[in-house]
């Protein structure tokens, strides 16, 4: 942690900020944290209350429950195990559909490249008809090159919010869209 290099946080202007949502997975709630000098935390807290209305008391109580030791121990194994299983299932199916994968060993999504120069924009055109969509690679291009982007044939497929029971249906929808384009 960066904090080990700070002798006295209350005598500094340093903010150490993080988020605890990836491993704790609480639907509908995002939890972040800030470590800083007490005076800075008070100012930040005042702004949060004034500028954003603050966080509801039930949300605060729920957030505290998320950090109970037993829940954290369970989340540290259950979340990676679940995502690993989903990553493997979807990854195998995507490869069988002729997609190239550019994914790591963690996370809850796959980066895929469509075959034959097909664009993710065209893929979404077919997916929209089925009530589905993917995140187009061009939307992640920091240079905003649009159709000239080298990411035009890439898309991100997020399996994090999907129930395991939807797998067959998800793959069937994607397969129909890809077949229509290739």
Language-model region placement:
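Short, conserved active-site loop motifs that form the nucleotide-linked donor/cofactor pocket
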Residues: 14, 99, 132
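Short amphipathic alpha-helical segments
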Residues: 29-30, 106-108, 153-156
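Short hydrophobic/aromatic beta-strand micro-patches
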Residues: 35, 111-113, 158-160
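Conserved core segment of the aminotransferase class I/II
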Residues: 4-81, 176-178
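PLP-dependent enzyme catalytic core of the Aspartate aminotransferase-like
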Residues: 9-10, 129-130, 142-182
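Surface-exposed helix-capping loop/turn segments at secondary-structure junctions
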Residues: 74, 94-103, 182
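Conserved glycine-rich beta-strand-loop-beta hairpin in the small C-terminal domain of fold type I
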Residues: 64, 80-91, 101-113, 150
């Amino acid at each position: 942690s960066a904090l080990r290099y700070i002798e006295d946080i209350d005598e500094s202007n340093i903010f150490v900020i993080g988020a605890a949502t990836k491993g704790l997975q609480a639907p509908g709630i995002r939890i972040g944290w800030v470590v800083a000098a007490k005076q800075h935390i008070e100012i930040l807290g005042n702004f949060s209350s004034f500028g954003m209305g603050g966080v509801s008391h039930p949300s605060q109580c729920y957030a505290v429950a998320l950090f109970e030791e037993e829940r954290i121990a369970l989340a540290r194994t259950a979340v990676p195990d679940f995502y690993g299983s989903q990553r493997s299932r979807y990854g195998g199916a995507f490869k069988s559909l002729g997609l190239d994968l550019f994914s790591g060993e963690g996370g809850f999504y796959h980066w895929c490249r469509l075959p034959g120069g097909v664009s993710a924009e065209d893929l979404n055109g077919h997916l929209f008809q089925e009530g589905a969509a993917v995140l187009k690679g061009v939307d992640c291009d920091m240079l905003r090159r649009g159709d000239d982007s080298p990411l035009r044939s890439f898309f991100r497929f997020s399996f994090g919010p999907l129930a395991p029971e939807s797998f067959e249906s998800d793959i069937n929808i994607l397969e129909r869209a890809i077949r229509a384009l290739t």
